[in-house]
Amino acid sequence: MAKRVLVVEDNELNLKLFCDLLRAHGYAAEPVRDGREAVARARDVAPELIIMDIQMPHVTGYELILELKADEALKAIPVMAVTAYAGREDEERIRGAGADAYVSKPISLARFMEAVRGLE
């Protein structure tokens, strides 16, 4: 059975790219367009990995990571942050919130998949 990956991204083009890339590599990608739905969807889908943008309207990926890691049922799920924030301080802050991997935009498809595989 394919590993389930929840992809939380408000940009439709990036969401499609990430989901298509994951599916092409044998993963079952579940898209979420609004960060406000991410925790409920994670409970429903029970993914093996959550990939999320950090810059989103309504709720940031940073806030979502904190919420996921505070939830007993979800805290063990690895989180990969995808962000335009490329500074060392940004990465430390995001990892400090609980992200298990960090990939900066613009995305290298090979690097993206390498980070995904590194969380298996």
Mark where each language-model region is.
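Conserved acidic carboxylate
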Residues: 9
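Active-site beta3 strand of CheY-like receiver
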Residues: 45-51
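C-terminal output helix
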Residues: 107-116
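Short hydrophobic/Thr-rich beta-strand motif most characteristic of the beta2 strand and flanking loop
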Residues: 26-33, 41
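Charged docking surfaces used in two-component/phosphorelay signaling
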Residues: 16-24
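Receiver (REC) domain active-site loop signature in two-component systems and cognate sites
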Residues: 56
